């Protein structure tokens, strides 16, 4: 757990220092697609409110779990390449886990007899590539989240997203 936090913190610091003087240029206004690889797989929508700020919604699923996440994100050009953007942000999630589910987690194994509410805070740090000349964006990110209602529990979810942009 500590190793993941150190890796996330180091990546965030490198990203912040390398993009401090660069401004992002959104290559699309809205993107809709799929996300997978972490705790939940599901749907994602990202909408830019200006050239460097976006809001993202994620509807995630896994067996017995549904979760909705909202994120506020800042974007900045990565590696002086206009089609690549670093992004980071924060938000929150709410969801539910069905009763009768067994959860294995870092030595804190649990069985949920009843339906349970999930509420917590989220962060995100990633890299997005808007493929030039076609309406597709690919992103890879780390999505740390703090579960408050059933926790406290801190997890870091790596994931990839594929969005159709317009």
Question: How should these model regions be labeled?
Answer:
Residues 1-9:
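Bacterial N-terminal signal peptides that target proteins for export
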Residues 8-16:
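Bacterial N-terminal signal peptides
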Residues 18-24:
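Sec/Tat signal peptide C-region and signal peptidase I cleavage site
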Residues 25, 30-32, 57-59, 110-116, ...:
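Outer-membrane beta-barrel domain signature
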Residues 28, 37-41, 64-68, 84, ...:
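Residues that define the transmembrane beta-barrel architecture of outer-membrane proteins
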Residues 35-39, 89-99, 143-147, 165:
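Short glycine-rich beta-strand segments
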Residues 47-140:
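Gram-negative (and chloroplast) outer-membrane scaffold detector with strong preference
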Residues 132-166:
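Predominantly the C-terminal beta-signal and adjacent terminal strand-loop region
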């Amino acid at each position: 757990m500590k190793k993941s936090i150190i890796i996330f913190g180091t990546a965030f610091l490198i990203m912040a220092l390398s993009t401090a003087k660069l401004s992002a240029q959104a290559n699309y206004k809205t993107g809709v697609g799929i996300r997978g690889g972490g705790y939940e797989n599901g749907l994602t929508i990202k909408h830019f409110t200006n050239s460097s700020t976006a809001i993202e919604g994620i509807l995630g699923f896994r067996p017995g779990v549904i979760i909705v996440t909202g994120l506020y994100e800042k974007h900045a050009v990565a590696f002086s390449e206009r089609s690549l953007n670093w992004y980071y942000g924060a938000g929150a999630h709410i969801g539910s886990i069905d009763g009768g589910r067994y959860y294995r987690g870092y030595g804190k194994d649990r069985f949920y007899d009843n339906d349970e509410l999930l509420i917590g805070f989220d962060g995100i740090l990633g890299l997005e590539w808007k493929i030039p000349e076609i309406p597709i964006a690919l992103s890879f990110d780390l999505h740390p989240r703090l579960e408050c209602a059933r926790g406290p529990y801190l997890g870091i979810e790596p994931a990839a997203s594929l969005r159709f942009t317009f």
